[in-house]
């Protein structure tokens, strides 16, 4: 295994950190925590903004950053945390890389799951990679990427307490002090007190009915299951070997057979697909005798519905959250959001009105958690399925594009290319393209001819012509692309050359 290029990559520049024998009494001697951020998912609960190609962790819902970026900032203290490991999928890989780049965050690795296999396999992947890179005594913090959390002294204290328990071999989960009888979360019953706000886990409870949730809340012994975990890599691997060996063996084979592609680690598809699709709670946490819970009371929300977004945003005097291009009249207790067309809402109470570039959702906030049923109905209809799959804006290594208009035999897009980046050299069989430079400078290659486009200039790319677009300038390049032809699908493309990092040669860049 050591000879595999991935293993050499993982072990390079790092030393194994051993835990001092007195670390349980002195938490200042604990090793750095290695965050493993779970950034997969399908993107259905906050439709129409979240889609299969853009899950809610990549949306700016609370504050100026996306939820994924907020998660990265939460583990940015280099005195406490090592570089984060991100587990995601093929569809989200460029979003992960781009949003980390925007913050200036260096990721340890971006690991791509070839197929979704739930959280047990994802946690096993993170544990195996962290053990190989940092040593089996390394502390692993597993975080969902789509939660809203206030990082204050209470939060930091809970993480320290979890570290101390994890260093003793406990598999620690974070239980959130419930503030209402929620039916959308699982619950954890606390058991024997272990010290420093940590209890043994007595049992896990499935998402309850409203009546049962109220009864659990009344006891004072139950906490919401946050889906956050902290443990030593060795501990979780040993427990998986005992309680979920089929998950662990498939993951080990997938890591051993993985390949490194540019900035991504691609798990071996055949091996990883053999892993059962099961949550870490079912596979392990409900079976192990070493489960512990940190009883936490920091501000937390999984933002799992538009109702949750409304509750977590600052409301005006009418109880409204108004974001973007919106006007509300005689409306209260509502969430109205649009960054595209102007939304005007009148005489409404307790509703969510959400507009994306190509769809609008209107529904009662109290029923917003049931939006998944609506998305399934849309996905089952061939006329609306694309509204659940494709987000109008897609991010690529070179920049990205937004689809502005679709029609019979034509499509209009806004392209944006980062400085020094270029697209692959390619051609289309069924469409021609017009490019209009709106901002910046474009280098356009058509067959053997290279043309420089400035603002307000345009160029035509005939059907079947080999072509490429690059940005040799120092500012973002923006173009309007008009496609015309009999077929405009994304699979009508033949790549002639595709530079792995989409970088322009230094000799063709402008400026010093």
From Swiss-Prot:
UniProtKB keywords: GTP-binding, Nodulation, Nucleotide-binding, Nucleotidyltransferase, Plasmid, Transferase
Family: Belongs to the mannose-6-phosphate isomerase type 2 family.
Keyword Glycoprotein part of the UniProt annotation: no
Catalytic activity field: alpha-D-mannose 1-phosphate + GTP + H(+) = GDP-alpha-D-mannose + diphosphate
Protein name: Mannose-1-phosphate guanylyltransferase
Pfam families with a match to the protein in the record: ManC_GMP_beta-helix (PF22640), MannoseP_isomer (PF01050), NTP_transferase (PF00483)
InterPro entries membership: GMPP_N, Man1P_GuaTrfase/Man6P_Isoase, Man6P_isomerase-2_C, ManC/GMP-like_b-helix, Mannose-6P_isomerase_type2, NTP_transferase_dom, Nucleotide-diphossugar_trans, RmlC-like_jellyroll
EC number of the protein: 2.7.7.13
BP GO annotations: GDP-mannose biosynthetic process; polysaccharide biosynthetic process
Lineage top rank: taxon: Bacteria
Recorded GO MF terms: GTP binding; mannose-1-phosphate guanylyltransferase (GTP) activity
Xref: CDD domains: cupin_PMI_typeII_C, GDP-M1P_Guanylyltransferase
């Amino acid at each position: 295994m050591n000879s595999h290029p991935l293993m050499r990559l993982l072990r390079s520049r790092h030393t194994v950190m051993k835990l001092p024998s007195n670390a349980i009494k002195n938490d200042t001697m604990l090793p750095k925590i290695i965050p493993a951020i779970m950034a997969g998912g399908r993107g259905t609960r906050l439709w129409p903004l979240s889609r299969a190609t853009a899950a809610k962790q990549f949306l700016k819902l609370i504050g100026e950053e996306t939820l994924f970026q907020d998660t990265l900032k939460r583990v940015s203290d280099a005195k406490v945390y090592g570089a984060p490991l991100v587990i995601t999928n093929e569809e989200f890989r460029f979003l992960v890389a781009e949003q980390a780049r925007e913050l200036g965050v260096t990721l340890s690795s971006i690991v791509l799951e070839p197929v979704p296999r739930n959280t047990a396999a994802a946690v096993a992947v993170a544990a195996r990679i962290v053990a190989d890179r940092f040593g089996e005594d390394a502390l692993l913090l597993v975080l969902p990427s789509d939660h809203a959390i206030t990082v204050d002294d209470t939060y930091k204290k809970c993480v320290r307490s979890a570290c101390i328990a994890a260093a003793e071999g406990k598999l620690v989960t974070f239980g959130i002090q419930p503030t209402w009888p929620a039916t959308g979360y699982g619950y954890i019953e606390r058991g024997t007190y272990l010290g420093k706000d940590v209890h043994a886990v007595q049992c896990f409870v499935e998402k309850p009915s409203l009546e049962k949730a109220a009864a659990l809340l009344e006891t004072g012994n139950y906490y919401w299951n946050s889906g956050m975990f902290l443990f030593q890599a060795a501990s979780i691997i040993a427990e998986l070997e005992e309680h979920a060996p089929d998950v662990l063996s498939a993951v080990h084979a997938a890591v051993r057979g993985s390949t490194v592609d540019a900035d991504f680690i691609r798990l071996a598809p055949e091996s990883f697909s053999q892993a059962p699709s099961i949550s870490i709670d079912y596979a392990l946490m409900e079976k192990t005798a070493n489960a512990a819970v940190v009883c936490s009371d920091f501000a937390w929300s999984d933002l799992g519905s538009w109702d949750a977004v409304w509750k977590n945003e600052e409301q005006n005097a009418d109880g409204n959250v108004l974001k973007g291009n919106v006007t509300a009249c005689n409306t209260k207790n509502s969430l109205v959001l649009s960054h595209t067309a102007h939304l005007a809402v009148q005489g409404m109470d307790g509703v969510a009105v959400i507009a994306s570039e190509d769809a609008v959702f209107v529904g009662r906030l109290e029923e917003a958690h049931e939006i998944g049923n609506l998305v399934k109905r849309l996905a089952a209809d061939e006329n609306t399925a694309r509204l659940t799959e494709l987000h109008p804006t897609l991010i690529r290594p070179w920049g990205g594009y937004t689809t502005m208009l679709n029609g019979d035999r034509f499509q209009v897009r806004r392209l944006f290319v980062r400085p020094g980046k270029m697209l692959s050299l390619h051609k289309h069989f069924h469409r021609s393209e017009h490019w209009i430079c709106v901002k910046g400078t474009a280098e356009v290659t058509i067959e053997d001819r290279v043309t420089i486009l400035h603002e307000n200039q345009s160029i035509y790319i005939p059907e079947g012509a080999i072509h490429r677009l690059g940005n040799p300038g120092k500012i973002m390049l923006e173009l309007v692309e008009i496609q015309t032809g009999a077929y405009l699908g994304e699979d009508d493309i033949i790549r002639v050359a595709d530079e792995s990092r989409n970088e322009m040669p230094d000799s063709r860049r402008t400026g010093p």
